[in-house]
Structure formats: C-alpha cells, structure tokens
Amino acid sequence: MRIERVDDTTVKLFITYSDIEARGFSREDLWSNRKRGEEFFWSMMDEINEEEDFVVEGPLWIQVHAFEKGVEVTISKSKNEDAMNMSDDDTNHQFDDQVNELLAQTLEGEESLEDLFEQRKQQKKNHQDKQQRRAHKPSNVRNIIVKFDDLEQVIDYAYHNNQNTDEFEDLLYMIDNKYYYSIHFDDSVSQEMINDSYSQLLEFAYPTDKTNIYLNDYAKIIMSHNVTSQVRKYFTDTNE
C-alpha cells in the first residue's frame, strides 16, 4: 500500500488488489460483506496513523477511484471546530457509514470496469484476424477513434487533412502523453465516406482499441468541436 500525505488534514493511498488479498481479504469480501469491509478499512486507517500520525477524529470525507490494478482512496478530516464536540462513538459511527457508502461506490465502479475490460477483450478478439492494423477499415460504425503519438502528429493532421468538419463532431483527449481523436459522424454520412475518412486519419495517426467509455473516464478532454480548426488557431505548421 502506498500512502501519500497531502496536507495536515488529507491523506491519499493506493492499494493493489494483490495487496488486498495478501492482507487476508478478497474483493468479494469488500464489495459484499459489510463487516469485512469495515474491518479492512479500519486496518488501513491504523496503518495510516502509524506511518503518518493521521488520527481519525471528527467527520471524514472519503473519495474512491477504482482502477484496473487497485483502488485509490482520499481521506480528509474536517477542519470544522465543531468536530471537537463529537464523541469517539459518534466518530466511529460516522466513519462506518462513510465506509459503507465508499464500498457501494467502489462496487459500482468495479462493475463498470468489468464491462469496460470485457469490451476491450472483445475488441481485441475482433481484430485478431486482421492482417495489418493500417489496412483495417471500420464496418457499419459512426464513431472512430485514432491515436497520435505526440502533438506534432496532431498539428500535421490539422494542417494537411481535407475532411469536411461539418459532417461530424469531434473530441481530442490526452492520457499518458498520448493524444486520442474521437469522431462521431452524422447519420447523413455514408459508410463509404466514413471508411475514407478513417483511411485519411491513418496517414497521420494509428488505430487504437481505446473506447469512448475509457477515454471519458480516464483521459482529459483537450479540445472539442472542430478540433482541427482550434489546432490551426493555436499552433503553426511544424512542416513549414
């Protein structure tokens, strides 16, 4: 478990699922067994207190983010002086309630993550019989996503493509220093035109198995709506 002290009232921790299991708990215990869930989070708080002298007192605010390999939890103590009037029993009861809410939120995140991983698994399976990535053309889809390795590739595409931007809505995402360009075509656009647009994109970018669900959850939206026009507005052509 990795613990980060943000400030006097806030700590952040990340614990992998393998670490959770090494402590004698399973994911099923946490999501479905209230008592085991409370036991696990209290043990985490004891460990945080030992390492960071972070004593649980008064109201707490807990945020959780579920990822593929583990869970990130942010815990903040109230700065309100009224918290000093709370008894230990009140504090423990309040913390238990928030732990239960935390587990419910994380369970929802787990379910959506499982759906996401299943989608990505299915996508990879569908691509196994393709001879070349760049030879692949979308079939009967109205949304395509490609990956740019760096900003220069994005700028190059913005200045040298000849696609009609009135025919689609687009978004530019960034995650892990990579750029992902998502285009959703109007119903009036034929599949042949979509395939042609995809081929043009692959002259500057690369295919990707990232989905809109994944990008919306984990990536940052850099630009939206006529992305190429915005890129040309803020950047000069690197090939000039």
From Swiss-Prot:
GO molecular function terms listed in the Swiss-Prot or TrEMBL record: protein-macromolecule adaptor activity
Pfam families registered for this protein in UniProt: MecA
Residues making up the signal peptide according to the UniProt record: none
Biased composition (Basic and acidic residues): 119-132
UniProt-annotated stretches for the region Disordered: 119-138
Matching InterPro entries: MecA_C_sf, Neg-reg_MecA
Gene3D superfamilies for the chain: 3.30.70.1950
Summary of the function given for this chain in its UniProt record: Enables the recognition and targeting of unfolded and aggregated proteins to the ClpC protease or to other proteins involved in proteolysis.
Domain notes: The N-terminal domain probably binds unfolded/aggregated proteins; the C-terminal domain interacts with ClpC.
Assembly, per entry: Homodimer.
Family: Belongs to the MecA family.
Name of this protein: Adapter protein MecA
Species for this entry: Staphylococcus epidermidis (strain ATCC 35984 / DSM 28319 / BCRC 17069 / CCUG 31568 / BM 3577 / RP62A)
